[in-house]
Amino acid sequence: MRIILLGAPGAGKGTQAQFIMEKYGIPQMCTGDMLRAAVKAGSELGLKAKEIMDAGKLVTHELVIALVKERITQDDCRDGFLLHGFPRTIPQADAMKEAGIKVDYVLEFDVPDELIVDRIVGRRVHAASGRVYHIKFNPPKVEDKDDVTGEELTIRKDDQEATVRKRLVEYHQQTAPLVSYYRKEADAGNTQYFKLDGTRKVAEVSAELATILG
């Protein structure tokens, strides 16, 4: 069961990735984690990655694909894997295909931009404990105060509206074209493509995933 999750930041991919990992016992492959692990292990690919990153450059598609290929040969990937946050662009998807990395399911989480902005911008955090609130969906008992300590809540830089809107623009420019790319792949019989309504409750989305994945 080889799965790719698509969707804008804040669409709920991370939450559902956790559900899939726990239910089906397959690992999530995050390219950032793979890069760090390879650098730490001092493997040939890791040394190459370190050299590029130390120079302040972006790691090439080829190197990331090589890391993915190496990672999927490991024991915990026997029953499949979950890719979340990769591929991000059509050249990366093409490179995966050329490398012979097959994908069984592509799952798109569809949430309108304004709802994503609402979800993320409303977050408030108690920095010391990591407790997260939401002004609309999970408000603190006292406005802008932590329930336990009474200390001030803050807004993370990543949760500020300008940052969220910038990330959404990047998503629509770079990653959204993958939707039509993988739909064509599904039409050609190379994968199965499902679009899920990410505006629903977490449990409802998880239930639909369980039906799709069996």
From Swiss-Prot:
SUPFAM superfamilies: P-loop containing nucleoside triphosphate hydrolases. It is found in: Cytoplasm. One of its GO terms (cellular component) is cytoplasm. Residues 30-59 are annotated as: NMP. It holds the Pfam family ADK. Its EC number is 2.7.4.3. Keywords: ATP-binding, Cytoplasm, Kinase, Nucleotide biosynthesis, Nucleotide-binding, Transferase. The keyword Calcium does not apply. Its main location: cytoplasm. One of its GO terms (biological process) is AMP salvage. It catalyses: AMP + ATP = 2 ADP. Residues 122-159 are annotated as: LID. InterPro entries: Adenyl_kin_sub, Adenylat/UMP-CMP_kin, Adenylate_kinase_lid-dom, P-loop_NTPase. It comes from the Bacteria. ATP binds at G10, A11, G12, K13, G14, T15, R123, V132, Y133, R200. AMP binds at T31, R36, K57, L58, V59, G85, F86, P87, R88, Q92, R156, R167. Pathway: Purine metabolism; AMP biosynthesis via salvage pathway; AMP from ADP: step 1/1. One of its GO terms (molecular function) is adenylate kinase activity. Consists of three domains, a large central CORE domain and two small peripheral domains, NMPbind and LID, which undergo movements during catalysis. The LID domain closes over the site of phosphoryl transfer upon ATP binding. Assembling and dissambling the active center during each catalytic cycle provides an effective means to prevent ATP hydrolysis. Belongs to the adenylate kinase family. Monomer. Catalyzes the reversible transfer of the terminal phosphate group between ATP and AMP. Plays an important role in cellular energy homeostasis and in adenine nucleotide metabolism. This is Adenylate kinase. It comes from Yersinia enterocolitica. The gene is adk.
